[in-house]
Amino acid sequence: MRLFISLPVLIVVLAMALEGPAPAQATPDLSSTFENLPDKLKEFGNTLEDKARAAIEHIKQKEFLTKTRTWISETFGKMKEKIKTTFA
């Protein structure tokens, strides 16, 4: 009984696989590719701009932290030296 039911299902699946891609899955023609090109380029440009801005912002923040850390260490060193000369 199971073979009797599974054989038609297997034939239908095999027929669907061999008939080829559906029209929606077919490769687009050249004109539709050129029509979508400006939109894709604009999207690519926006993505690139966002990533560049984020990278620059990250670098600025990192540089700010480095400068702050350097300033704090220099100030602490000066205070330490002043205390040594005052109490020595």
Curated annotation (Swiss-Prot):
GO terms for molecular function: fatty acid binding; phospholipase inhibitor activity. It comes from the Eukaryota. GO terms for cellular component: high-density lipoprotein particle; very-low-density lipoprotein particle. The keyword Ubl conjugation does not apply. Residues 1-26 form the signal peptide. Keywords: Lipid transport, Secreted, Signal, Transport, VLDL. One of its GO terms (biological process) is triglyceride metabolic process. InterPro entries: ApoC-1_sf, ApoC-I. It is found in: Secreted. It holds the Pfam family ApoC-I. Its main location: secreted. Inhibitor of lipoprotein binding to the low density lipoprotein (LDL) receptor, LDL receptor-related protein, and very low density lipoprotein (VLDL) receptor. Associates with high density lipoproteins (HDL) and the triacylglycerol-rich lipoproteins in the plasma and makes up about 10% of the protein of the VLDL and 2% of that of HDL. Appears to interfere directly with fatty acid uptake and is also the major plasma inhibitor of cholesteryl ester transfer protein (CETP). PANTHER family: APOLIPOPROTEIN C-I. Belongs to the apolipoprotein C1 family. This is Apolipoprotein C-I. It comes from Bramus lutescens (Transcaucasian mole vole).
